[in-house]
């Protein structure tokens, strides 16, 4: 290893890894022969893995029979889920909900085990955890080596669909909670509210009761754990006190055996305290399955709901021991716990993975009503909800925007007039947003990695929606006077001369994070009719972004930077919020990557500050965590706020340029603004500066300071100056901002030509 300050290099001959600050680059320089040998070895290894996993799983299952099923599941759940919200970092957390689920599924293959040992110690837990992790490592290698097995003859790299299959399976295997719980709760309550009465009569509970029971189960177990911890702490204090009293010759304990106190008194106070803590720690974990499990009556008391509702809920969301297929051994991307995350035995119930419970409500209820007459009503409700919520979120950010829903327009095709629809249209300054919403979800075969179903579902959920938005965009661009009919029958006429940018948005109800963060990788599937890709985002991510955006122009700028990722086609992130977190921290600039020699670039996690913020505002975290935001100086904030508040067209041209500036350029711009304003204040003369930016469009920017001039005269002066300078310099674009130094504010006129 070669270490030099912030640079670390690991060179293993044919494999090289370099860390430069927060960035990690991996490169290989295998010869063709080395590559062929590697593929052949991986292909051979791939064939052996299923049997290896089966053998390990059988041995592991035999080991599990010596434990009480509820106890061992509770221990592994505790180990993998307990976090400190004050210090939690997603990328540092070694536990996994998937480990708990796999253990539970293995236990559910068999009848409930009462166990042969009465106490599960830490060594038992570590061995159990190690066995699970070992099987998951094998499973990961099975899917990593799959392409080598498929291409052991031609040695070709994985195809686009093979890559998407791998990502889909890995996401389904490992990733849980693709949104924040309070957002999901709001979505569930609003989505199923119109069906509450029908649900109540059909399944015995409504959506509000379902959400209350999810909270009730978590609260019941949490309160029990806290109470046991409190008792352990109190006992530690009391027992140590009595040991000290015993040493002084005073022993009047009725609570603890004298033999115990006598033994502890032979130790130093520090050693006695350690011994007591170890013993009470063991007591805390004794019978952990009883703490984690509950009866319907106990849950009814905790949730303050009738026992009939409790039983109906548990009946729908529970699995019994012996219900899992006897052949199950390899961790699967799709499994029954994802829709029925509660297990039961002898009238006691347990939720091994609390993270699954809230997320199971929607797919489980959809399973129940799928083949019912209620399904069509639900589909309509679901689509309307997604459209309404999406437009509301965008409207909350773009406060001065004009927002329209469910528009109709007509196109002539083959001498026929055909009616088409557009889910949403937003007019914001000189920008149009054309929005299509898809409320459906990935099918189970697609989640399992079925190539044909992945292609079919992506086409249905993203490509078809995008084609509809493209059709509307083409209608606007190719029609002299585009006309839309609104839902109330009124007519909207689009004045094309006012718009410089058009964004196409595809919004889904279901997270599609295996595909949408690097949508350009789906182009080779042939599902898109146009090379121009949309911003495809799920409702949960859209909500976070809209809640964290500081001002309207920032959302427009984020869209421009985000869509640039598709154009560059080299960078990739785990999910949309990593892109947004990177934008807030570093601006989402990857223009230099194509010149770097890298053929692939992946972001690490950028959601830590977002997690901290939501933990804090929801009371999970006590330590203050500010809302994540871009570092923007007060002068730039003032410029942007005044431009946005001007009420004049084309201010987005200028705010976008200001946001596009690098830190160095912003510092220079601020310095010159201050200098020229002071000069004009001092001598009363006109002072200005001009800077040039070579971005996608070559732009000249002038800031002019005057004294004693009115706004309209200043605007005319800026326009004349900009037109002249644009012609003289052959720049494609010219922007000018005017400041009257004897008035409040920084922006009193602006032009863009």
List the predicted regions and their residue ranges.
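Acidic, metal/cofactor-coordinating or nucleic-acid-engaging core segments within structured domains
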Residues: 458-492
């Amino acid at each position: 290893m070669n270490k030099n300050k912030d640079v670390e290099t690991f060179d293993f001959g044919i494999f090289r890894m370099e860390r430069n600050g927060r960035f990690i680059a991996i490169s290989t320089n295998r010869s063709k022969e080395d590559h062929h040998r590697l593929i052949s070895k991986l292909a051979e290894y791939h064939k052996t893995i299923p049997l290896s996993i089966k053998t390990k799983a059988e041995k592991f299952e035999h080991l599990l029979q010596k434990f009480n099923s509820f106890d061992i599941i509770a221990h592994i759940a505790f180990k993998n889920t307990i976090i400190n919200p004050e210090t939690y970092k997603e990328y540092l957390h070694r536990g996994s909900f998937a480990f708990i689920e796999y253990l539970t599924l293995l236990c559910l293959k068999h009848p409930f085990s009462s166990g042969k040992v009465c106490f599960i110690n830490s060594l038992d837990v570590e061995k159990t955890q190690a066995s699970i992790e070992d099987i998951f490592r094998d499973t990961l290698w099975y899917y990593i080596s799959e392409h080598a097995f498929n291409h052991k003859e031609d040695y070709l790299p994985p195809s686009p669909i093979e890559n998407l299959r791998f990502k889909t399976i890995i996401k389904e295997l490992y990733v849980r909670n693709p949104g924040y719980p309070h957002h999901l709760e709001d979505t569930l309550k609003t989505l199923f509210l119109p069906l509450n009465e029908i649900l109540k009569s059909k399944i015995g509970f409504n959506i509000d009761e379902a959400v209350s029971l999810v909270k009730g189960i978590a609260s019941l177990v949490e309160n029990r754990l806290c109470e046991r911890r409190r008792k352990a702490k109190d006992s530690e204090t009391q027992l140590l006190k009595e040991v000290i009293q015993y040493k002084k010759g005073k022993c009047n304990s009725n609570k603890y055996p004298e033999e115990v106190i006598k033994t502890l008194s032979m130790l130093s106070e520090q050693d006695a305290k350690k011994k007591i803590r170890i013993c009470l720690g063991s007591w805390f974990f004794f019978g952990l399955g009883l703490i984690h499990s509950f009866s319907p009556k106990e849950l009814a008391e905790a949730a303050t709901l009738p026992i009939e509702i409790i039983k109906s809920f548990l009946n729908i969301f529970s699995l019994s021991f012996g219900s899992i297929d006897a052949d199950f051994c390899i961790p699967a991307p799709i499994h029954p716990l994802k829709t029925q995350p509660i297990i039961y035995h002898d009238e006691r119930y347990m939720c091994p993975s609390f993270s699954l419970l809230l997320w199971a409500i929607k797919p489980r209820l959809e399973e129940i009503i799928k083949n019912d007459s209620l399904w069509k009503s639900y589909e309509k409700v679901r689509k309307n909800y997604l459209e309404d919520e999406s437009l509301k979120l965008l409207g909350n950010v773009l406060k001065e925007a004009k927002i329209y829903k469910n528009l109709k327009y007509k196109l002539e095709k083959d001498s026929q007039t055909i009616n088409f629809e557009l889910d949403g249209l937003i007019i914001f300054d000189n920008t149009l947003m054309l929005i299509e919403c898809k409320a459906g979800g990935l099918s189970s075969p697609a989640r399992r990695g079925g190539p044909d179903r992945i292609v079919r579902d992506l086409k249905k959920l993203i490509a078809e929606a995008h084609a509809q938005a493209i059709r509307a965009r083409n209608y606007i661009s190719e029609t002299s006077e585009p006309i839309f009919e609104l839902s109330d029958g009124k007519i909207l006429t689009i004045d094309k001369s006012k718009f410089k940018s058009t964004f196409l948005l595809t919004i889904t109800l279901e997270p599609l994070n295996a595909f949408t963060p690097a949508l350009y990788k789906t182009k080779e599937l042939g599902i898109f009719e146009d090379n121009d890709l949309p911003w495809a985002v799920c409702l949960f991510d859209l909500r976070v972004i809209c809640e964290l955006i500081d001002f309207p122009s920032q959302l427009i700028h984020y869209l421009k930077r985000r869509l640039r990722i598709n154009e560059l086609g080299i960078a990739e992130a785990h999910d949309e919020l990593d892109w947004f977190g990177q934008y807030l921290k570093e601006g989402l600039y990857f223009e230099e990557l194509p010149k770097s020699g890298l053929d692939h670039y992946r972001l690490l996690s950028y959601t830590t500050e977002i997690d901290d913020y939501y933990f804090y505002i929801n009371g999970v975290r006590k330590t203050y965590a500010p809302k994540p935001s871009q570092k923007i100086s007060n002068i730039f904030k003032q410029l942007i706020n005044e431009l946005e508040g001007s009420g004049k067209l084309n201010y987005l041209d200028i705010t976008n340029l200001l946001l596009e500036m690098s830190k160095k350029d912003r510092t220079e711009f601020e310095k010159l603004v201050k200098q020229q304003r002071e000069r004009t204040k001092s001598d009363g003369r006109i002072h200005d500066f001009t800077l040039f930016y070579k971005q996608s469009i070559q732009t000249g920017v002038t800031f002019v300071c005057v004294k004693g001039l009115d706004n309209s005269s200043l605007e005319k002066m800026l326009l004349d100056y900009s037109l002249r300078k644009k012609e003289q310099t052959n720049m494609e674009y010219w922007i000018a901002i005017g400041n009257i130094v004897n008035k409040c504010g920084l922006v009193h006129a602006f032009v863009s030509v």
